[in-house]
């Protein structure tokens, strides 16, 4: 997936989704912003496009999910399952990148994994083999993504049961100047999800805007 792709950002009106959208659009991909409210999605897409000098379009979640070759889910944990239920019939045959971290307010800097261990693995179980669910972007700062004049100095852990889907997402990540790290099967997503709360703690403790992770010992 190193060429130009059509990418639907489901729940793309938030900070994380907007940051990913900006990076992908600047890299030359066709980016679609989705929301439950199509008007809100169009307004967000217009604002992002003006900010970056690129073309980004917006529409309802179902419309952009249908148009996208790959979908990236960037909604809060509480909205993860309802959003997937809204579009699950459209996702068959596609790759779904799920950036969900199971943050439970108000104590978002404490690890609170769901009973099954991984929020993203639960979505793979829900959707079945027809959809290739890939966990990625949980540990990437939205603030860093949105500063297009600066590189995002961290790695992206990528987990999925389907190895070709994992590699496709790693290749997509490379197009925005970041390094995807093959993190193995979807159950390993629990580690990436837990790291999000730890990084929030680090941000607050050390007063940094967006701590990330870097895997050492691997050649670029």
Which residues fall in each region the model found?
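Rossmann-fold NAD(P)-binding glycine/threonine-rich loop
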Residues: 100-143, 147-148
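Rossmann-like NAD(P)-binding element
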Residues: 52-54, 59-95, 102-107
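Phosphate-coordination loops involved in phosphoryl transfer and adenosine-cofactor binding
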Residues: 3-6, 93, 153
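NAD(P)+-binding Rossmann beta1-loop-alpha1 motif at the extreme N-terminus of oxidoreductases
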Residues: 1-47
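Hydrophobic Val/Ile/Leu positions in short beta-strands of Rossmann-like dinucleotide-binding domains
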Residues: 9-10, 73, 158
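General beta-strand structural signal in soluble alpha/beta enzymes
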Residues: 58, 132-138, 181-183
């Amino acid at each position: 997936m190193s060429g130009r792709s059509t990418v639907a950002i489901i729940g793309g009106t938030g900070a994380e989704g907007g940051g990913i959208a900006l990076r992908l659009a600047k890299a030359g991909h066709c980016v679609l912003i989705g929301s439950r409210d199509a008007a809100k999605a169009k307004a967000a897409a217009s604002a992002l496009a003006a900010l970056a000098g690129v073309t980004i379009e917006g529409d309802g979640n179902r419309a952009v999910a249908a148009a996208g070759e790959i979908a990236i889910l960037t909604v809060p944990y509480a909205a993860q399952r309802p959003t997937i239920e809204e579009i699950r019939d459209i996702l068959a045959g596609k790759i779904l990148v799920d950036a969900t971290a199971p943050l439970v307010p108000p104590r978002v800097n404490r690890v609170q994994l769901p009973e099954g261990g991984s929020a993203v693995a639960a979505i793979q179980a829900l959707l079945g083999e027809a959809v290739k669910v890939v966990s990625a972007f949980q540990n990437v700062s939205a603030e860093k993504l949105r500063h297009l004049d600066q590189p995002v100095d961290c790695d992206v852990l990528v987990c999925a049961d389907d190895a070709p889907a994992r590699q496709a997402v790693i290749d997509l990540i490379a197009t925005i100047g970041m390094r995807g790290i093959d993190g193995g099967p979807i159950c390993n997503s629990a580690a990436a999800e837990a790291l999000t709360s730890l990084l929030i703690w680090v941000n607050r403790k050390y007063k940094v805007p967006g701590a990330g992770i870097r895997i050492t010992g691997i050649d670029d």
